């Protein structure tokens, strides 16, 4: 959507969402990432003062970036203006929050370890799926497929670790970035990067 927030919602047949529905692609977000560019004419006002451009949408529509993100299940957006100016504190916070609203939001709901078997229940609290797969716990790969965690749902992943060594042991989990040079993929859970960068600390096993 190259006019995101401006011509996204269903206030005109030629807008992005109606076009998706007409092409029978309105459910494509479940398998393929949706993205686009915030319409250049609203990039500044949507960051500086969102209320000032609410009535600036196409065909009488209102500008609501967050509503457009939720409706399209957008995973990424381009806002060039935000990177070509100096943002004050509230503007930067607003920009970061809008970015955080896009895509997946993985969080560990609970975990347990029994006789070396680790189970991790992961929730997706975002607006879109995680489109790549691959997880590791220590030296064990967890079963399951991150791409199959539906939005608002949870799924349990499990893997077998070597026999528990004596003493307390810290259990970590990470999502492997499919891009060799990509940034670590992070959970929105307390304990992220606590022990090692890129890893979520789940907890410690009981002392034997």
Regions found by a protein language model. Name each.
Residues 62-110:
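Catalytic cores of secreted or luminal carbohydrate-active enzymes
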Residues 99-208:
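Extracellular/luminal regions of secreted and cell-surface proteins that mediate adhesion/ECM remodeling
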Residues 1-83:
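Catalytic-core regions of glycoside hydrolase
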Residues 10, 21, 64, 88-90, ...:
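Serine/threonine-rich low-complexity intrinsically disordered regions
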Residues 11, 86-94, 186-192:
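Surface-exposed flexible segments
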Residues 55-57, 85-88, 117-118:
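A short linear-motif detector with a strong N-terminal bias
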């Amino acid at each position: 959507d190259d006019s995101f927030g401006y011509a996204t919602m269903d206030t005109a047949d030629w807008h992005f969402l109606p076009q998706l529905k007409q092409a029978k692609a309105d459910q494509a977000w479940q398998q393929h990432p949706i993205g686009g560019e915030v319409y250049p004419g609203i990039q500044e006002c949507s960051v500086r003062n969102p209320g000032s451009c609410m009535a600036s949408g196409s065909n009488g529509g209102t500008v609501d970036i967050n509503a457009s993100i939720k409706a399209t299940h957008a995973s990424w957006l381009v806002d060039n203006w935000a990177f070509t100016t100096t943002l004050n504190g509230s503007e930067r916070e607003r920009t970061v929050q809008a970015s955080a609203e896009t895509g997946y939001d993985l969080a560990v709901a609970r975990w347990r370890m029994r006789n070396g078997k680790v189970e991790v229940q992961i929730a997706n609290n975002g607006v879109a799926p995680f489109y790549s797969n691959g997880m590791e716990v220590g030296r064990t790969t967890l079963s399951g497929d991150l791409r199959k965690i539906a939005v608002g749902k949870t799924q349990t992943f499990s893997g077998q670790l070597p026999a528990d060594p004596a003493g307390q042991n810290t259990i970590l989990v990470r999502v492997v970035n499919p891009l060799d040079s990509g940034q670590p993929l992070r959970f929105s859970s307390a304990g992220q990067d606590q022990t090692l960068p890129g890893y979520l600390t789940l907890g410690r096993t009981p002392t034997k």
